[in-house]
Design a protein with these regions (language model features):
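Conserved lysine of the Walker
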Residues: 449
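Hydrophobic anchor at the beta1->P-loop junction of P-loop NTPases
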Residues: 441
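P-loop NTPase motor domains
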Residues: 53, 60-79, 90, 253, ...
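Conserved P-loop NTPase
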Residues: 726-777
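Post-Walker A helix-loop "phosphate-sensing" segment adjacent to the P-loop in P-loop NTPases
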Residues: 459-469
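Hydrophobic positions on the alpha1 helix immediately C-terminal to the Walker A/P-loop
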Residues: 452
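A short helix-turn-beta junction within AAA+ P-loop NTPase domains corresponding to the substrate/partner-engaging
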Residues: 485-489, 698-711
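Extended, folded cores of ATP/NTP-driven motor/assembly subunits in large transport
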Residues: 1-404
Length: 777
């Protein structure tokens, strides 16, 4: 037998003691503050958690790259340690879900909508997979003391994290309470919310940590076990097929049940593996030689070597070739699985379903007889292995059991965006948790862009204390804003609503003198009013001087009282001696005292409502460039005010491509896009004209830097551009090609997942969100 395996079995051999209590079933002897468990006489273990990656929806080339990178990870495993890969399916706790995601009623007029939204969320949670899949790596090693183990885990952990990072997966080490929570949640289904463990408090009171995690009762039968009122069964993979598809692990763990699957891996040092393979090959060749000698003695000189002997020789040569020339390692592995159910009938039915799935892949699972306790301690991420049903594999054949499938997006206190098409889990995302929470919603007309934006607006209006600002060029949001109690500001040359272009608060300057920043804005405004020609140095100096002058009294009064207007600014220009000042005053007269003076009057609308919609449908061609600048500046005013109050602001800009048609509004928007994050604000751009949008270098940069993108059904040319810009595979592209409304891809940080968002039509909220004729309010 191979020396590595012999010494491992010797180390793992322990004297069997009959458990005197439920606590004795758990094989952990000692726990330490840094997440290390002692699980044997000199055996220590440490668990790491890693995130899923988009393997199932990757292109063939990407899959190959991921497979090879995962093989590299397996090759890097230390031959002196045992590595356990665990996939843990745990059911989403309804109480936790309600606490985290349902919207609390506040007793106001919006409660009817909150009840409707909560009912939708609960229906989706019930219909969804409602299974959260966690993935772990547990390393166990024999060391003389915990200090040696600590040093070892620090080194191995750094390598492990680096390898997972190259795969695009985030790997973190688990603390003691996090490891205990895994065990607690498995043994005490339905009591997840009650788990609380403080290691210092436990020691102080002299309590046993096992009391916090073990079930009330445990009974082990011949081929199943019972913990409390639940039933469980441990299986192991007995027979492997010659060829296994890389989707087998994903299919086995796709069951909507609490289950755990573990693969224990024992790598063999290459020199030892090569010696063993050469010895086996020599044995096969000796058998062939002996057979031929016997045939020759019988004068049977033309006899061909039996097929099975030839096959053995061929396979051993291939195996040796893998080890010596193809960078493969020899690995011993054991695959075990535990699943639980509420009744024995359900357990038997689930077992049969798992056996059928394995048979489909020409593999054979078997139930452990009289070894259920040993099997349970093998499959769970303690770091122990009590089942020795080893199978010899190469790195490549072991990598087929790839633990990756698809990323799920599940942020605490996030917003519901739909269901993951592959895992069927709910997509709950919080843009505030991203490095750059700005968003784009892209799709053809009728693809569900406005619906997606309104869904987000409704959630923010009902569940948060954030302010919401909408720029609406198509008058699509008015019914929703009215229903939510917001303010609609109609902006046009003939509208009675006015916004003062020179509105400014003390926070406008980002800590510096706000007039300096406002002066820049007035210069941009004047360039637009004069006709888009660049201002000369003289003109800029005059504008800067006049801006400082008109704001002087307002600043001296501590930003209280009447704010100056563009009319005051023009009057100040006329007081200057330079002829250039008179020219500027004449050029802007149409917009200060003429028929387009809507932005030269005092603001007479409530721009401080929690929900403000700027309706710019009637803004004519002449007023559009200046109108967009003034609206964006008004939004900047609001954002800076909210920052001082510690309040978040969400800005939704429909048909954002309109803003990129004007140089100044495009540049202003680009600056806003970069700066809003530090102000606690988040911008969203909505458009169907992706091709037009990407013609602008500014827009292209903004899109590439946005970490949150919702892509719905796309036109052919737009798909090609998006695929290039965001590195989308052909398979992923199929989710934004000729799909129904509300279906597509959602990019959250580095995750890109296919989603579907179907909202119940028999609700008031649906009527407020839909733009289909005859369905709206």
């Amino acid at each position: 037998m191979i020396k590595t395996l012999t010494s491992l079995l010797k180390q793992d051999k322990e004297k069997f003691t009959v458990p005197k209590g439920v606590q004795d079933v758990i094989p952990v002897k000692t726990i330490y503050d840094d997440g290390i468990f002692r699980v044997g006489k000199d055996k220590y273990s440490k668990t790491f958690k890693f995130t899923d990656i988009n393997y199932a929806v990757a292109s063939r080339e990407d899959k190959e790259a991921m497979f090879l990178e995962y093989s590299e990870l397996l090759n890097s495993l230390d031959s002196g340690a045992t590595t356990k890969l665990t996939i843990n399916n745990r059911r989403l706790n309804r109480l936790d879900f309600e606490k985290s995601f349902l919207i609390s009623e506040t007793g106001d007029y919006l409660d009817k909508y909150r009840r409707e939204y909560n009912k939708m969320l609960l229906d989706k949670a019930t219909g969804a997979n409602s299974i959260v899949q966690d993935k772990y790596v547990t390393i166990s090693i024999n060391k003389k003391n915990v200090e040696d183990a600590r040093t070892y885990f620090a080194r191995v952990g750094a390598d492990l994290i680096a390898h997972f990072s190259r795969l695009g997966s985030k790997c973190v080490e688990l603390e003691t309470d996090e490891r205990l929570r895994i065990i607690h949640d498995f043994f005490r289904v339905g009591e997840e919310a009650s788990f609380h463990f403080d290691i210092k408090e436990t020691r102080k009171k002299g309590h046993d940590f096992k009391d916090y995690i073990c079930p009330d009762t445990m009974e082990f039968e011949k081929d199943y076990f019972k913990m409390g009122d639940r039933f469980g069964r441990v299986l192991f993979l007995r027979e492997y097929a010659s060829y296994i598809k890389d989707s087998m692990v994903a299919e086995l763990t796709d069951m909507n049940r609490n289950l755990m699957m573990s693969i224990d891996i024992v790598p063999v040092p290459t020199d030892e593996a090569v010696r063993e393979a050469e010895s086996r090959l020599l044995g096969v060749e000796t058998n062939i030689t002996n057979w031929q000698r016997k045939q020759n003695q019988n004068n049977n000189f033309s006899a061909t070597v039996p097929y099975d002997m030839e096959q053995q020789k061929k396979e051993m040569k291939e195996f040796l070739d893998d080890l010596t020339t193809r960078d493969q390692r020899m690995m011993f592995s054991v695959l075990t699985m535990v699943h639980t159910a509420d009744s024995k009938e359900q357990l038997d039915s689930d077992t049969e379903a798992l056996l059928t799935t394995a048979r489909k892949h020409l593999c054979q699972f078997a139930v452990l007889k009289y070894q259920q306790m040993d099997g349970l301690n093998t499959v769970m991420p303690f770091g122990t292995r009590k089942i020795d049903a080893f199978r010899t594999l190469t790195t490549e054949s072991l990598a087929v059991f790839i633990p990756f499938r698809v990323q799920d997006i599940y942020h605490e206190n996030g917003i519901y965006y739909g269901q993951n098409v592959i895992s069927k889990n709910m997509i709950i995302a919080d843009r505030k948790q991203l490095l750059n929470g700005n968003e784009f919603i892209l799709g053809v007309s009728g693809g569900g862009k406005s619906f997606a934006a309104k869904n987000e607006i409704i959630n923010l209006a009902l569940a948060s204390d954030a302010d919401i600002i909408i720029i609406d060029p198509e008058r699509e949001y008015s019914p929703l804003v009215k229903a939510m109690g917001g303010e609609i500001i109609n902006i046009s040359a003939t509208s009675p609503n006015h916004i003062n272009a020179m509105d400014m608060n003390r926070e406008y300057g980002d800590g510096a003198n706000p007039v300096i920043l406002k002066s820049e804005f007035i210069m941009s405004l004047c360039e637009q009013l004069i006709g888009g020609n660049n201002l000369g140095a003289k003109q800029k100096s005059i504008i800067d001087r006049c801006t400082a002058s008109v704001y002087r009294t307002y600043q001296q009064n501590d930003y209280q009282g009447t704010v100056p207007t563009l009319q005051d600014f023009r009057d100040e220009l006329l007081k200057q001696d330079e002829p250039e000042a008179k020219e500027i005053a004449l050029a802007i007269e149409l917009f200060t005292h003429g028929s387009l003076n809507t932005f030269a009057k005092q603001t007479n609308v409530d721009t401080n409502s929690f929900l403000v919609c700027y309706d710019i449908l009637d803004l004519g061609k002449q007023l559009m460039p200046i109108g967009m600048l003034v609206v964006l500046d008004s939004i900047l005013n609001r954002i800076t005010q909210n920052r001082a109050k510690g309040r978040h602001t969400f800005i939704f800009i429909d048909e954002i491509y309109l803003l990129f048609q004007h140089e100044y509004s495009a540049n202003f928007l680009f600056t806003l896009w970069k700066r809003v994050r530090k102000y606690g604000a988040y911008a969203s751009g909505i458009t169907q004209n992706v091709d037009d949008l990407l013609q602008s270098h500014t827009a292209r940069t903004m899109l590439a830097n946005s970490e949150f993108i919702i892509m719905l059904n796309q036109a052919a040319t737009d798909r090609v551009e998006l695929a290039k810009l965001l590195n989308i595979s052909d398979l992923q592209m199929s989710y934004i090609t000729n799909v129904e409304a509300g279906h597509g891809l959602i990019k959250v940080g580095s995750s890109l997942v296919p989603f579907a968002n179907r909202f119940p039509k028999n609700t008031q909220l649906y009527k407020l969100m839909t733009t289909k004729p005859g369905e709206g309010v």
